[in-house]
Regions:
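A short beta-strand motif that forms the metal-chelation/ATP-contact edge
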Residues: 136-138, 175, 246-250
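A glycine-rich phosphate-binding loop feature that marks nucleotide/adenosyl-phosphate handling sites
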Residues: 239-246
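ATP-dependent carboxylate/phosphate-activation module, predominantly the ATP-grasp catalytic core
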Residues: 164-231, 242
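A conserved helix-loop-beta module that forms one wall/lid of the active-site cleft
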Residues: 89-153
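Residues at the starts of beta-strands that form the adenosine-phosphate
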Residues: 21-24, 181, 250
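ATP-binding N-terminal substructure of ATP-dependent carboxylate-amine bond-forming enzymes
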Residues: 1-99, 108-109
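Flexible, glycine/charged-enriched surface loops at secondary-structure junctions
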Residues: 233-238
């Protein structure tokens, strides 16, 4: 099984436990990853733009002379539906289709999806709001909070958008879908580790998140409605802000 991700360690360990022989392309090649996989290539999927040709070449080298069940694409493809399509044209894709990723990572399409499924979602725009004080500036398909900052002074452009601030504590849901049903595996509480100019940088997560039963059921129901509209395949996550009994899906 091929694995391509910013960090492939956890996926490789899971694949090995499942009886697969993982071949990993990631940015680290740490000892734990190398112990779990049968082949490794160093490819930096955190750098933007991603070297798509380099990734394809690395995957070709890993699979040379081997039968491959398919490829699992992890973190690093959040804004890369086009690259995901290139990969899927070469190997069976074990996960969400490029079209699914593109739809869910399009901020206006996702906002419309949340409205259609009755899920609270912060107001979103691709043009600067008249009063930017209560808004954030984000990169489409961004991950890890590095790309999020206050909207004051930010300029519109390709691949960026604006989103109204919402109150609450960050919680992430881990999901597993089979293209029909979705199973919520758990909720984790998150926190930020700010740096100068990067106030929302991801700091870590711990599970389980302390959620009231009613909130947990409502969040699970929201995920199920979303999956009914856009069926998910494989592992995925959904980020929320929890404010008492209310929540926003980000």
């Amino acid at each position: 099984m091929l694995i391509a991700a910013a960090s492939g360690r956890a996926l490789a360990a899971s694949a090995r436990r499942g009886g697969f022989v993982p071949l990993v392309a990631d940015a680290f090649g740490d000892q734990d990853t190398l112990a779990a996989c049968a082949g490794h290539a160093r490819v930096d999927l955190m750098r933007r733009p991603v070297d798509g040709d380099g990734l394809i070449d690395a995957l070709d080298r890993l699979t040379a002379g081997r039968d491959c069940a398919g490829i699992v694409c992890g973190s690093g493809f959040e804004d890369g539906a086009g690259l995901l399509a290139r990969v899927a044209a070469r190997w069976p894709l074990l996960g969400n289709a490029p079209e699914t990723v593109a739809r869910l990572k399009d901020p206006l399409a996702f906002a419309a999806l949340c409205r259609a499924t009755d899920i609270r979602h912060p107001k979103t725009a691709v043009t600067p709001p008249p009063d930017a004080q209560d808004w954030l500036f984000k990169r489409m398909g961004g991950a890890g909070g590095w790309h999020v900052r206050a909207a004051q002074g930010a300029k519109p452009g390709r691949g960026v958008y604006f989103q109204r601030r919402a109150a609450g504590e960050p919680v992430s849901a881990l999901l597993l879908g089979d293209s029909r049903r979705v199973l919520v595996l758990g909720f984790s509480a998150q926190w930020a580790a700010p740096l100068p100019g990067r106030p929302f940088r991801y700091g870590g997560a711990v599970r389980p998140a302390p959620l009231a039963d009613g909130v947990l059921r409502a969040m699970t129901a929201a995920i199920e409605r979303l999956n009914a509209a856009v069926p998910l395949t494989g592992l995925a996550s959904a980020d929320f802000l929890i404010d008492g009994d209310a929540f926003h899906l980000l």
